[in-house]
Amino acid sequence: MLFRSWLPSSMRHRTLSSSPALWASIPCPRSELRLDLVLASGQSFRWKEQSPAHWSGVLADQVWTLTQTEDQLYCTVYRGDDSQVSRPTLEELETLHKYFQLDVSLAQLYSHWASVDSHFQRVAQKFQGVRLLRQDPTECLFSFICSSNNNIARITGMVERLCQAFGPRLIQLDDVTYHGFPNLHALAGPEAETHLRKLGLGYRARYVRASAKAILEEQGGPAWLQQLRVAPYEEAHKALCTLPGVGAKVADCICLMALDKPQAVPVDVHVWQIAHRDYGWHPKTSQAKGPSPLANKELGNFFRNLWGPYAGWAQAVLFSADLRQPSLSREPPAKRKKGSKRPEG
């Protein structure tokens, strides 16, 4: 503790109270964004609460700390050079604004979802402020390749070790060293799979290297992933599924969280259970008793018909609630609002 107490302020994690001059803010009520619900819910795996209500992580190859009050989102940026110690620039604030997609009104979306779905209305009362991040497609792709048959804690560890081994070193704060996300060439290197296995990625190591090589050698590089942002949802989903280690669920995660496809509904065991338990949903096109490609597509259509073009965002609210308070959902299947359209599978 003595060592940490003597670190210069430029080498320590900041808090809003300890260095207010180095922070800037964006008007943003908690009903539009709850950092604790968004940054620790399995969207990104690179944010940690380093001090109470202060979240630190890497965004756009810079290290940030975020916190919030009832009506403001605060941020500070560590640039790695004492001569550049200053509050975030307008450009950096714009980066944060785009990352949280703050141009999308959660109030309007929640109001619509509650008007057509009584179950959502009940759950949302305690889970305001859940929104989708707009992540870098490369980081999102390889993070979710690591998510196969995994949980949030283990995925977080895998992604962190991957960044430490293959990503550029950015800065050390207290006893934490931050790294940027690796580029495709680093992940496609001849020794990458062996190294990734030693880091605990298991069979996913082969998929990480193979997908990096496929993008570089068959698709022309990272620009291909960026171009999928403007492709139709079905086209982008199909293209992602050609990559090693990317199935329908992982492709939907990438579409939703990195490729501007808010209608994408990733289906895993949690979402399947929510649909079965809280909506009385059963697949009509297959006999599947759990997630499968055909049944997952049917379930995605069910939720898209119910919630509309931002169905993936609504699903994220229920997913976040189910992770934290599954008892909220242990009631008879939801009744739709009188007069609302009954979705079809």
UniProtKB/Swiss-Prot annotation:
GO BP, sorted A to Z: base-excision repair; cellular response to reactive oxygen species; DNA damage response; DNA repair; negative regulation of double-strand break repair via single-strand annealing; nucleotide-excision repair; positive regulation of gene expression via chromosomal CpG island demethylation; positive regulation of transcription by RNA polymerase II
- Gene expressing this chain: Ogg1
Native source species: Mus musculus (Mouse)
Q: Pfam family example for this protein?
A: OGG_N
Show the catalytic activity.
2'-deoxyribonucleotide-(2'-deoxyribose 5'-phosphate)-2'-deoxyribonucleotide-DNA = a 3'-end 2'-deoxyribonucleotide-(2,3-dehydro-2,3-deoxyribose 5'-phosphate)-DNA + a 5'-end 5'-phospho-2'-deoxyribonucleoside-DNA + H(+)
The record's InterPro entries line, in alphabetical order, gives:
DNA_glycosylase, HhH-GPD_domain, HhH_base_excis_C, Ogg1, OGG_N, Oxidative_DNA_repair_enzyme
* First-listed, main subcellular location of the protein, grouped into a coarse class: nucleus
The active site annotation covers 249 (schiff-base intermediate with dna)
Binding of 8-oxoguanine, residues:
266, 268, 315, 319
**What is this protein called in UniProt?**
N-glycosylase/DNA lyase
**EC numbers:** 3.2.2.-, 4.2.99.18
Instruction: Report if keyword Methyltransferase is assigned.
Output: no
GO CC entries: mitochondrion; nuclear matrix; nuclear speck; nucleoplasm; nucleus; protein-containing complex
Provide this UniProt record's keywords sorted from A to Z: DNA damage, DNA repair, Glycosidase, Hydrolase, Lyase, Multifunctional enzyme, Nucleus
Q: What is the lineage of its organism?
A: Eukaryota, Metazoa, Chordata, Craniata, Vertebrata
